[in-house]
């Protein structure tokens, strides 16, 4: 979605609503495309006393295997998108403002970039996920196993001293 910003920059108090669905199927995380259904983007672009801001909420369903136990998990994410828009930056790079020199905002690209930044680096089924047994591969969230953890060869000498 392209938003023409010229009238917004030139009209104090103007508020343009944004409400649409965006495909995020191209978002890739660890070789997977976890967002298959379209994301819902709802918000507005507003000129308030000459300060133009984009404020929106992005909502989507994230479906991927847990990084510890590999169980498929489906979770709904909602996060805010907030940017102050300027036609030109006065001094080099400034992360507080989003420069739109041609007064056109490609909202799809911006939301996709923000989604990539907002996604967790590790995706877990729950905070207390125990993962898989490194010996037999059982899901430790569902069952216990009798496997003995392999001993680090560097610590084996200390273990022998403790046994004596």
Where does each model-flagged region fall?
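Structured interface patches
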Residues: 1-164
